[in-house]
UniProtKB/Swiss-Prot annotation:
<dbReference type="InterPro" id="IPR035647">
    <property type="entry name" value="EFG_III/V"/>
</dbReference>
<dbReference type="GO" id="GO:0032790">
    <property type="term" value="P:ribosome disassembly"/>
</dbReference>
<dbReference type="Pfam" id="PF00009">
    <property type="entry name" value="GTP_EFTU"/>
</dbReference>
<keyword id="KW-0648">Protein biosynthesis</keyword>
<dbReference type="Pfam" id="PF03764">
    <property type="entry name" value="EFG_IV"/>
</dbReference>
<feature type="binding site">
    <location>
        <begin position="88"/>
        <end position="92"/>
    </location>
    <ligand>
        <name>GTP</name>
    </ligand>
</feature>
<dbReference type="InterPro" id="IPR000640">
    <property type="entry name" value="EFG_V-like"/>
</dbReference>
<dbReference type="InterPro" id="IPR047872">
    <property type="entry name" value="EFG_IV"/>
</dbReference>
<dbReference type="GO" id="GO:0097216">
    <property type="term" value="F:guanosine tetraphosphate binding"/>
</dbReference>
<dbReference type="InterPro" id="IPR004540">
    <property type="entry name" value="Transl_elong_EFG/EF2"/>
</dbReference>
<dbReference type="GO" id="GO:0005525">
    <property type="term" value="F:GTP binding"/>
</dbReference>
<dbReference type="InterPro" id="IPR020568">
    <property type="entry name" value="Ribosomal_Su5_D2-typ_SF"/>
</dbReference>
<dbReference type="Pfam" id="PF14492">
    <property type="entry name" value="EFG_III"/>
</dbReference>
<comment type="similarity">
    <text>Belongs to the TRAFAC class translation factor GTPase superfamily. Classic translation factor GTPase family. EF-G/EF-2 subfamily.</text>
</comment>
<protein>
    <recommendedName>
        <fullName>Elongation factor G 1</fullName>
    </recommendedName>
</protein>
<dbReference type="GO" id="GO:0003924">
    <property type="term" value="F:GTPase activity"/>
</dbReference>
<dbReference type="GO" id="GO:0003746">
    <property type="term" value="F:translation elongation factor activity"/>
</dbReference>
Length: 703
C-alpha cells in the first residue's frame, strides 16, 4: 500500500501552554477547520473533543495528551494536502511528565500564550523541556479579545523570561472588544475573518491607515531576522531592504525556526474563531517535517556502547518509541507510539528491544481525540495507537526483530510526594493492587510500593493534584474506593564531608564453611550527580569477581540512610583496599562488607537531611500582598521577586518554599485573600533541611 501523504508534508506538533491559555479551545478549532469535527466543542461547557477523561472535563483542564490526526490544505486552499498529527499536552504543573513525554516524540511545537497573562511559570517549564529536546516552535498569542490583551508585551516577555527570540510575522488589528483580525507582515495585507461562517471564510484587505506605520516597523524587524539566515540573503537585504521576495522570507524564517534560532509569533482568538487558520498555515510554513530534524539516535541492541541511528524513511528498518499508555474502556490497553523509520502492519511481530521480548502487533488505531479508526499499517513519521501489546511501557523501543535498535530512553522525574492508600473494604484489596499497577504503567512519574515496616501501600507522585486525580481514576475506572493518608514529603539523605578509609569487615567462622569479606572505602559528597562507585583496588587485594558485590551491597544500603531511613543521594564511593580468604570469601560476604563500610562511613561524613524545594508563584490583588508575603515567610519561604501583573491585575510573587510547608496551602491562601489569589508550584531542587526541622523529622520517623 503506497504512502498517502509524502513524509515531507507531515507535521508532528504539540500544542502546549499554561493552564487556561486556551490551548484545548485552540486544538478544537484546528479540528473544526481541518474538517474533522463538525460541532465545535467548547471547554467552557465541558464538551471538548480532546479532553476525553471525565476529570479533565469536570476540572476544565486537559489531563492526557491525546494524539489526533488532521489534514490541511492552507487557509486559502493554496497548499498540497498536509497531514498534521497533533499531540495535545496538559498545562498543569502536576502533569509536567505528560508534556515531557510528548516533547520527546514531537518535531515541532506551537506555544499558546494568554494575551493578558503572557509567559507564566508553566510556560517556562514547557519552554525548558522544548529546549532539552531541541524542539523548534512558533508562538500563538491567544485570547486577543480579552480586556488587557497586549501582543507586544508577550513578545517582550518571551525574550526576557524565556530568552527566546520572538519574531512577529503578524500584528493584531485592535485588541479587547475591538480585535478584528491580523496584519500578515509577509504579504503586508490585513486578514479579516468572517463571523457568519465561524471564521472559515476570510478576506485580504488593505492595512488600516492607523496601523500602516507600525506594520512597516515590525515587517522591517521580521525581514531583518530572515536575512540573517545566510550571507547571500544578508547582502541582498543590505543592498536593498525591499528586495527579498515572499518565498525567500518564508524559506529563511523556516530555516532559522528549525535551527531553533527564532520563534515566529502570531495572534488571534480561538474562542472568537480568529487567527487559528493562519496559525495552521504557519505550522506548515515554519515547523519541520520528520525529514527536517536530525535522525533519531540510539544504540546497538547487542552492544550498548555502539551508537546507532534511524533516518525518517520507509526503506529503513522499522523503529518506533512507545510514548504513552492508556487504558480504554472498550479495547483495553492502548500503546501510543511514534514511528521513526520503516513500515509495520497490524499482525506483524515486533521486538520490544528495551525488554528483549517479541510481541505480535494487534490492531493499529489512528486516534481523533476519543474516536478511533482502524488502519492496516503505519509508516515513518506516523503516530498511532496499538492494541494487544502486553509488555510495552512508556519509553520502550518497538522495532524490527531482524534489525534491532534501542532508541534513546526518556528521563522521568523522581516523585516528590507520597501518601498511604488503603481500600475501604477488604474485597477491594486485590482490585486496588491491579488498578494501581495499571495506573503506574501508564504514568512513569507515579510509583507504587509497599512499606516494609507497616505493610501499607504507598503511592508517590509529582504533587497533591496528581495523586488526587489518580485516586479519583481508581474509583471511576476500576470501581475501587480508597482512603488516603496525609501526604508525606520525599526527604533524602546525603553527606557534607569526606570520610576516608572506613572499613567494613564481615567474618563468620563457626564450623563448616565460613564467610569472609573485607572492604575499605572513602565516601565523599557528589552534589547533583547521584551515586558513583569507583573501583581503585590495586594488586588484586579484592579479587575482580567480588568488586560488583561490594557495589551491590552499597547500592542496597542507599535505599535507607542512617539518619531516618530515607534514600541516600549524591555520594561518591571509592573502593580503595580490602582483603579476602581463599576459601571463605564469596559474593554475599563482600556485599555485607560493602554495606557495613558504607553505613559506618556515612555516620562519619556529617549526614544531613534534604527536602524538596518548590518554586511557588502567587498572583494576588494588591490589598492582600502583606498577608501573602507574611504567610509565605511563616512557611520558611524565601521571596525571590515581585512584579506587577499586566493590566492592573495585582501582583505576582515568586518564592521558593519547602514542600513540607505547602500542604493545605490552597485553603489558607483562599481564606487570606477572600478567594481572590491563585498560585502554582512545581518542584525546583533538593536543599538541606534546617537543623530544627531536621531534628523533628528524624524524631517523628524514629518513633
Amino acid at each position: 500500500m503506497p504512502r498517502k501523504t509524502p513524509i515531507e508534508r507531515y507535521r508532528n506538533i504539540g500544542i502546549s501552554a499554561h493552564i487556561d491559555a486556551g490551548k484545548t479551545t485552540t486544538t478544537e478549532r484546528i479540528l473544526f477547520y481541518t474538517g474533522v469535527s463538525h460541532k465545535i466543542g467548547e471547554v467552557h461547557d465541558g464538551a471538548a473533543t480532546m479532553d476525553w477523561m471525565e476529570q479533565g472535563q469536570e476540572r476544565g483542564i486537559t489531563i492526557t495528551s491525546a494524539a489526533t490526526t488532521a489534514f490541511w490544505k492552507g487557509m486559502a486552499g493554496n497548499y498540497p494536502e498536509h497531514r498534521i498529527n497533533i499531540i495535545d499536552t496538559p498545562g498543569h504543573v502536576d502533569f509536567t511528565i505528560e508534556v515531557e513525554r510528548s516533547m520527546r516524540v514531537l518535531d515541532g511545537a506551537c506555544m499558546v500564550y494568554d494575551s493578558v497573562g503572557g509567559v507564566q511559570p508553566q510556560s517556562e517549564t514547557v519552554w525548558r523541556q522544548a529546549n532539552k529536546y531541541k524542539v523548534p516552535r512558533i508562538a500563538f498569542v491567544n485570547k486577543m479579545d480579552r480586556i488587557g490583551a497586549d501582543f507586544f508585551r508577550v513578545q517582550k516577555q518571551i525574550g526576557e523570561r524565556l530568552k527566546g527570540v520572538a519574531v512577529p510575522i503578524q500584528i493584531p488589528i485592535g485588541a479587547e472588544d475591538h480585535f478584528q483580525g491580523v496584519v500578515d507582515l509577509v504579504k503586508m495585507k490585513a486578514i479579516v475573518w468572517d463571523d457568519e461562517s465561524q471564521g472559515v471564510k476570510f478576506t485580504y484587505e488593505d492595512i488600516p491607515a492607523n496601523l500602516v506605520e507600525l506594520a512597516h516597523e515590525w515587517r522591517e524587524k521580521m525581514v531583518e531576522a530572515a536575512a540573517e539566515a545566510s550571507e547571500e540573503l544578508l547582502e541582498k537585504y543590505l543592498h536593498d531592504h525591499e528586495s527579498l521576495t515572499e518565498d525567500e522570507i518564508k524559506a529563511a524564517l523556516r530555516q532559522r525556526t528549525i535551527a531553533n534560532e527564532i520563534v515566529p509569533m502570531l495572534c488571534g482568538s480561538a474562542f472568537k474563531n480568529k487567527g487559528v487558520q493562519a496559525m495552521l498555515d504557519a505550522v506548515i510554513d515554519y515547523l519541520p517535517s520528520p525529514v527536517d530534524v536530525p535522525a533519531i539516535l540510539g544504540h546497538d541492541f547487542a552492544d550498548p556502547e555502539k551508537p546507532a541511528e534511524r533516518h525518517p524513511s520507509d526503506d529503513e528498518p522499522f523503529s518506533s518509541l512507545a510514548f504513552k499508555i492508556m487504558t480504554d474502556p472498550f479495547v483495553g490497553q492502548l500503546i501510543f507510539f511514534r514511528v521513526y523509520s520503516g513500515v509495520v502492519e497490524s499482525g506483524d511481530t515486533v521486538l520490544n528491544a528495551t525488554k528483549d521480548k517479541k510481541e505480535r502487533l494487534g490492531r493499529i488505531l489512528q486516534m481523533h481525540a476519543n474516536e478511533r479508526k482502524e488502519i492496516k499499517e503505519v509508516r515513518a513519521g506516523d503516530i498511532a495507537a496499538a492494541v494487544g501489546l502486553k509488555e510495552a511501557t512508556t519509553g520502550d523501543t518497538l522495532c524490527d526483530p531482524q534489525k534491532p535498535i534501542i532508541l534513546e530512553k526518556m528521563e522521568f522525574p523522581e516523585p516528590v510526594i507520597s501518601q498511604a492508600v488503603e481500600p475501604k473494604t477488604k474485597a477491594d484489596q486485590e482490585k486496588m493492587g491491579l488498578a494501581l499497577n495499571r495506573l503506574a504503567q501508564e504514568d512513569p512519574s507515579f510509583r507504587v510500593q509497599t512499606d516494609e515496616e507497616s505493610g501499607q501501600t504507598i503511592i508517590s507522585g509529582m504533587g497533591e493534584l496528581h495523586l488526587e486525580i489518580l485516586v479519583d481514576r481508581m474509583k471511576r475506572e476500576f470501581g475501587v474506593e480508597a482512603t488516603v493518608g496525609k501526604p508525606q514529603v520525599a526527604y533524602r539523605e546525603t553527606v557534607r564531608t569526606t570520610a576516608a578509609d572506613v572499613e567494613g569487615k564481615f567474618v563468620k567462622q563457626s564450623g563448616g564453611r565460613g564467610q569472609y569479606g573485607h572492604a575499605v572505602i572513602t565516601l565523599e559528597p557528589n552534589p547533583g550527580k547521584g551515586y558513583e562507585f569507583l573501583d581503585e583496588i590495586k594488586g588484586g587485594v579484592i579479587p575482580r569477581e567480588f568488586i560488583p558485590a561490594v557495589d551491590k551491597g552499597i547500592t542496597e544500603t542507599l535505599k535507607s540512610g542512617v539518619l531516618a531511613g530515607y534514600p541516600v543521594v549524591d555520594v561518591k564511593v571509592h573502593l580503595t583496599f580490602g582483603s579476602y580468604h581463599d576459601v571463605d570469601s564469596n559474593e554475599n560476604a563482600f556485599r555485607m562488607a560493602g554495606s557495613m563500610a558504607f553505613k559506618e562511613a556515612m555516620r562519619k561524613a556529617k549526614p544531613v537531611l534534604l527536602e524538596p524545594m518548590m518554586a511557588v508563584e502567587v498572583e494576588t490583588p494588591e490589598d492582600f500582598m502583606g498577608n501573602v508575603m507574611g504567610d509565605l515567610s511563616s512557611r520558611r519561604g524565601i521571596v525571590q521577586g515581585m512584579e506587577d501583573i499586566a493590566g492592573g491585575g495585582g501582583k505576582l510573587v515568586r518564592a521558593e518554599v519547602p514542600l513540607a510547608e505547602m500542604f493545605g496551602y490552597s485553603t489558607s491562601l483562599r481564606s487570606a485573600t477572600q478567594g481572590r489569589a491563585t498560585y502554582t508550584m512545581e518542584f525546583k531542587h533538593y536543599a538541606e533541611t534546617p537543623a530544627n526541622v531536621s531534628e523533628a523529622v528524624i524524631n517523628a520517623k524514629v518513633k
